[in-house]
Amino acid sequence: MITVAVPNKGRLHEPALKLLERAGIGVEEPLGRRLKARTTDPDIEVMFVRAADIPRLVEEGVAQLGITGYDLIVEAGAEVKELLDLRFGRARLVLAVPEESDVKSPEDLDGGTVATEFPNIARQYFEDVGVDVEIIQVSGATEIMPRIGVADAIVDLCSTGTTLKVNRLRVVDELLETSARLIANPDATDGEVIRRVYLSLKGVLNADGKCLVMMNVPRERLEEFHELLPGVTGPTVSEIYGDEDMVEVYAVVNEEDVSEVVLRAKELGAEGIIVLPIERMIP
């Protein structure tokens, strides 16, 4: 049995559960305030905790796997093994100041104050650029700190930029890009189960935005279809019993290319075209 730590709330909670479900690991929401929940896989349970606590819990072996943001992994400084970029929860950690501020670069903040929920990252950043600032740790509403006179600048997450605009803030610099990651305890002993989770999630990510296109095509035009359907390692070709003139061809195609591929395939004489969604794809 392994434990997967998942954010109990916030922007990573729902996407994490949906991704696990797509990977065949359906999660039962815990009753009341229960910390853990069973899954559809008898070898896996889920622990619901604060996203910021997950790196440490995985490092200490309380959970063997975890899903949390890269920003929180860096902030915690935890010794964990990063297995996958899960491609959701994308954002930037930025240094921002009020629009009317004279600050144009980090150096202009020398001797000033910076509010943030990421004191370790911010402190290291300013040390690296050789700027002396006072770091003020906050636990939320970072964007209002300059307006109420608490800080000259902030270091905060920015996904769409809307919050910065609403609070009349502008970006001075970008500290890092973040997204949700699958992390593991380096000393975890349940290697087979961990690898199963890894391959299932990777298969879902590989299948995102792709379809399987199948069709019967004239044998004499097979080379043209090879160019039309490159696939992952080239299209797969199968014989059709009792038909010497046609062969079956199928390949993985990007969703945005499907309409064009189908149209071109019809022009080349394809018949019986089928487009199927792909749940998982493991090379």
Curated annotation (Swiss-Prot):
Q: What is its main location?
A: cytoplasm
Cited InterPro entries: ATP-PRT_HisG_long, ATP_PRibTrfase_cat, ATP_PRibTrfase_CS, ATP_PRibTrfase_HisG, HisG_C, N-reg_PII-like_a/b, N-reg_PII/ATP_PRibTrfase_C
Annotated family: Belongs to the ATP phosphoribosyltransferase family. Long subfamily.
Which HAMAP family does the record associate with it?
Answer: HisG_Long (MF_00079)
Known role: Catalyzes the condensation of ATP and 5-phosphoribose 1-diphosphate to form N'-(5'-phosphoribosyl)-ATP (PR-ATP). Has a crucial role in the pathway because the rate of histidine biosynthesis seems to be controlled primarily by regulation of HisG enzymatic activity.
Tell me the enzyme class: transferase
Pathway entry: Amino-acid biosynthesis; L-histidine biosynthesis; L-histidine from 5-phospho-alpha-D-ribose 1-diphosphate: step 1/9
Species name: Methanopyrus kandleri (strain AV19 / DSM 6324 / JCM 9639 / NBRC 100938)
UniProt GO molecular function: ATP binding; ATP phosphoribosyltransferase activity; magnesium ion binding
Q: What is this protein called?
A: ATP phosphoribosyltransferase
Q: Which domain of life is it from?
A: Archaea
Q: Which SUPFAM superfamilies match?
A: GlnB-like, Periplasmic binding protein-like II
Explain the regulation of its activity.
Feedback inhibited by histidine.
Swiss-Prot/TrEMBL catalytic activity: 1-(5-phospho-beta-D-ribosyl)-ATP + diphosphate = 5-phospho-alpha-D-ribose 1-diphosphate + ATP
Q: Which Gene3D superfamilies match?
A: 3.30.70.120, Periplasmic binding protein-like II
Q: Name one GO biological process term.
A: L-histidine biosynthetic process
User: Which PANTHER family does this chain map to?
Assistant: ATP PHOSPHORIBOSYLTRANSFERASE, ATP PHOSPHORIBOSYLTRANSFERASE ATP-PRTASE
Q: Which UniProt keywords apply?
A: Amino-acid biosynthesis, ATP-binding, Cytoplasm, Glycosyltransferase, Histidine biosynthesis, Magnesium, Metal-binding, Nucleotide-binding, Transferase
Q: Which EC number(s) does UniProt give?
A: 2.4.2.17
Question: Cellular component per GO?
Answer: cytoplasm
Cofactor(s) in the UniProt record = Mg(2+)
